[in-house]
């Protein structure tokens, strides 16, 4: 008689039989498309998602998300983590919660780089604050820390740093500047999860920080993001803002309790109403609905177990691909790790001596099916949605980030077949 499997066992059995990795290059043939990144999932992520749908108690954020938040906090040495539906949402929640907690006023200032992904800057503008731009330096492509103090005014409240593809600026200087001028150091860590500074996680230096779980990032839940801080009150503000602005913080089965997590679910919560209301419908902030699905939390738990392997491969492949490029392509420079840092690389950043070299090298790679990316926006002030914020011409190095810089992947999905093909394409440059 054969073995009889229940439905949960059947899901696990079928997934193990059918899925090694959802995406992989095991059968790669030279000339096939090479993506710059993508999620590395196997049957564990798939079965976690399916089992959460079939047997979980919640569709929206519930017990799996709560478990993921706890495990994530432990892995990245932070007291509190709150999951949202994207890294961009995480940035929006972070800035909105900072404004609320510290009572920032309209036109208060946040220092940022003009080069990077737009949703580092957009939440500042959306909250009625003013981004103060610092031109980049060309060694690391981060904003030039030496220029920051010249831009600080009585309205400056924070520095919001986004390490370039995982590679940070001089963090000691940033901490000193923040301490000297009573500023808050914040991190957009979406591209740099796991980056170290002097042997410790770079995120240890931030008051609050974010990360992204988009498929291209270090771990992926499909879409998703996290807001992190050691300040519980700040995280409570972040949670409220991403949960419609409500005051209630019940999760999972606690939603069903008559007394709720707080013990006073039905009480006199409103100053101007003499009656009992449900705490679940008390709104202390103007908020959004930025909640993830519980299956994303389940996937995140499995991805977190793979993080050390994923990060190690990114570091290894960045160094290998850097050597391929520098050995074969003249007029380009791959960005090295900043002194005192050990980046968790998101990609391989390439600075070209001229715009012509960049355009020809990008065309060469794309023609040979190796995916490239601009360094995101380049100077964001050149773009229609942002050009009103400042004069792009003032930021000459940032303009070079658009004309002379791009990146390729160092994806943990790669294998020796893919790496060998990338080397061949680099060697063909001189044919």
Model-derived segments and their meaning:
Residues 100-180, 184-189, 196:
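PLP-dependent aminotransferase-like
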Residues 8, 13, 39, 66-70, ...:
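PLP-dependent aminotransferase class I/II
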Residues 187-221, 236, 280-282:
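Conserved active-site segment immediately N-terminal to the catalytic lysine
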Residues 58, 63-109, 122-127, 133, ...:
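Phosphate-binding glycine-rich loop
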Residues 111, 132, 185-186, 210, ...:
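Structural detector of well-ordered beta-strand residues that form the stable sheet scaffold
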